[in-house]
């Protein structure tokens, strides 16, 4: 297994392509706000909180129910994920 630890910073509402991770992913909010429906319902997370995205869970893309934070909201996250040797940690769905 390979381990990926990445720090991201973004401003404005989420805008990412639909995707999944072959191995589970941990998302930790360093600062700002984020939202996830990994638990089955949308929840908002802020500084010091985290959520787990299960393996093969398809998410991202357009979801009209996703909470909106506005263009002036910036978020910094630490994302920890693993991948089997030779596999990408994120698979985008076309």
Task: Enumerate the language-model features and the residues they cover.
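Structural recognition of the beta-strand scaffold that forms the well-ordered cores
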Residues: 18, 26-28, 37, 50-53, ...
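Double-stranded beta-helix
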Residues: 62-94
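Short, conserved beta-strand element in jelly-roll/cupin
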Residues: 9-11, 21-36
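A short glycine-rich, His/Asp/Glu-containing loop-to-beta-strand
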Residues: 1-18, 80-83
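Extracellular/periplasmic catalytic domains that process cell-envelope and extracellular macromolecules
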Residues: 20, 28, 43-44, 69-74
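Membrane-topology and secretion signals of cell-surface/extracellular proteins
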Residues: 4, 15-16, 37, 55-58, ...
């Amino acid at each position: 297994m390979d381990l990926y630890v990445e720090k991201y910073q973004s401003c404005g509402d989420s805008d990412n392509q639909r995707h999944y991770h072959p191995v589970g992913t941990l998302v930790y909010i360093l600062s700002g706000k984020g939202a996830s429906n990994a638990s089955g319902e949308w929840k908002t997370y802020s500084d010091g909180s985290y959520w787990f995205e299960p393996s093969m869970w398809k998410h991202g893309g357009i979801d009209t129910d996703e909470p909106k934070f506005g263009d002036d909201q910036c978020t910094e996250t630490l994302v920890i994920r693993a991948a089997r040797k030779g596999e990408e940690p994120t698979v985008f769905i076309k």
